[in-house]
Amino acid sequence: MQNELPGFIFELKYRMPDGTGIYVKPQKKGFCDASGRRRKLYVELEKNGKTQQLYSIPDEYLPDRIISYCSGANSSMEDILIRSPRASLASDLYDLSLAMDVENGEGPVSGKEEHPGESSVARGEAAEEILSFYERLDVNPRVLFLDAVTSKFILPALFAVMPFDMQDDHISEKALRYATLRKKLLKRLNIRLIPAAFSLRIDDTRLEEAADRPQMSILRRLLSQDVKGKALSNCVIHRTSTDRLEEDGSLAGETAAVFLFESWEAEGEKVFYHPMLQRYFDGSPFALISTLLTAWREGVIREIHFSYRNGDERGLYEMEDLSDGELMWLARIGLILMAQNHCGENTLFLYDEPDVHFNDDWSRDFVRFVYAMCSMDGTSGNEFLVATHSDLILTDAMRSQIHLFENPTGSRTEVKELEISTFAAGRDSISKQVFKASSIGGFASDTIKELMAETDPEQLAQAISKIGPGYQRFRLQEQLYALLEKNDRIKG
């Protein structure tokens, strides 16, 4: 999306819903186009029987947004999606500056310049493009990376900002539909969650020193209670000092901001949201998430809390009262619900092991809820890439949707065709034929092997009484019958 290369040889092929085929690979090293501009990518577009050669992928053939959600603690997606693009663009800009210095006689000529043959005009155009990409990373990031830690920022956005324009002619209908889907999301967990408020603890010094990114400007304006010339309603701001000391010995300042949810009647149903945040973020919950994530990663937000009531019960609950599985369910499926057409017509979701922390009952409903939450109007251009080891999730996937990645030697990953269709297949068959795994644990398997060698019918019968139903119990019973028959023949 930034015309950057991953650092290895690759070929990328995909097809759009309208039939357009896109083929991408790296250009030859040092390649320049007719204008003298150095190019990194070779792109072919095949549409209506015609092929067009380009040097970048047009925006209309890229996702409006990429949302990456990784469950593991050892994920490198943050480096790949957030830090690496910025570092790569900075490196390109540095290389261009060296080439310009050499051209102007201000730098040494090494004979190994990165941009040989590139004209000064082309270098200037390249520099402007790099700066525009760099600015877009800050101003309107198209990639959001979330994990178990940052899941806490999803719940406030899910209830504060609804993904549509409040001036829409069909606002009541859309709000009711959205509220119904949110309720369905919660009902699956048997929770009657009614949002009360969310709050932020802000490090004033970090906020003052933070780079002047749009997200930081948004946060500063929110905390100043001056949003588009109006005071921020349903928000309590309290500034205080902490026990921490600044470098000059003064007490560090902190700001606590509490955002109170409101309910709005839509055809007799209560729809909870935050009116001012809804207007300020123009119906884009992802703009709110981006602001919160940026401030969190820069150390500006020290804490975030979310308070709710559970039905008619007295008292408030905190986000920490949810189990890991409950929070992960609301976060992973909630992201899909928020990605409605108002926020972009197509979003690419990269989900790594999305069933982590789920019990089997929730995993069984994961794919069903992906389809149910994807679009409120029945149309969606969203795509999902899901990495999983769950045989239960695979029972909801068609054979054409699955790619099996194997790394038998530990050095080269291979993509293989599935031997069976997993859709509605038995989990034992999937576990054995797809993952090459046994249907029982290793300890149980060793125990069964020992029992199959048992020659005392009484000992074997006693052991069988402790074995659960299934094929292994059947094997042991067959072995017991064989021993009893053998003993009868000996006695006879």
Predicted regions and their residues:
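Long, contiguous juxta-domain segments that are non-catalytic but functionally important
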Residues: 35-49, 276-280, 288-292
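Switch/communication elements of ASCE P-loop NTPase nucleotide-binding domains
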Residues: 1-9, 283-288, 294-445
